[in-house]
Design a protein with these regions (language model features):
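Short, well-ordered surface patches within globular domains
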Residues: 20-87
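Short clusters of hydrophobic/aromatic residues that line enzyme substrate/ligand-binding pockets
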Residues: 54, 91, 130
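Disulfide-stabilized extracellular recognition modules
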Residues: 20, 97-173
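Well-structured core secondary-structure elements of compact alpha/beta domains
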Residues: 89-95
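Generic secondary-structure boundary/loop-capping signal
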Residues: 42, 51, 88, 112, ...
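Terminal export signals
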Residues: 1-16, 132
Length: 173
């Protein structure tokens, strides 16, 4: 009989063939700093495009954590976020949890957006979600897979952006 793994901070047994995920790799203080920096980076870019600052939403943080867990477990459909599609999202799976690197991967998509046409572009969708004017709240979550040594960072936005037909009023330069 194979060994089973315990998800840290719970009594839930995880199938040993699946990734082993934890949040304890980062302390609460480190996570608070990470979230604060990510929100600051978002708001700095949003101000450049005349979008109001985002406010952190603890309920979205919880949803984002759950979604990150399920993504690393290859079960995103088990997340309420995946099922209901109520939020915008930016997601990355990466080996280092460095705010600026993560954020810049999304923000650098600005070069792919045509500000004259203001239409949805898959190649700029992370960027346009970040600066979407109607979005007011943000939630940030993550999971760490100790076996594969990767993080899943999930950023949720409410209300969601990238709504077809609404680019003209939500994106400005």
């Amino acid at each position: 009989m194979g060994a089973s793994c315990i998800k840290e901070n719970s009594a839930e047994t995880i199938n040993p063939q699946k990734p082993v995920i934890i949040r304890a790799k980062t302390s609460k203080d480190e996570m608070k700093i990470f979230k604060s920096k990510m929100i600051s980076l978002h708001n700095e870019l949003r101000r450049k495009y005349n979008s109001p600052d985002l406010l952190e939403d603890n309920n979205l943080n919880i949803e984002a954590d759950e979604y990150a867990d399920n993504i690393l477990l290859n079960e995103p459909q088990k997340s309420n976020v995946y099922a209901n599609g109520l939020y915008g999202e930016n997601i990355i799976v990466i080996d280092k949890k460095e705010e600026t690197t993560i954020f810049n991967k999304w923000a650098d998509e600005e070069k792919n957006f045509d500000f004259t046409k203001k239409k949805y572009s898959k190649d700029a969708s992370h960027f346009t979600q970040i600066i979407w004017k109607e979005t007011r709240n943000i939630g940030i979550g993550f999971s760490y897979d100790v076996f594969n040594k990767i993080y899943c960072i999930v950023v949720l936005y409410n209300p969601p952006g990238n709504t077809l037909g609404e680019f003209e009023m939500n994106i400005s330069k």
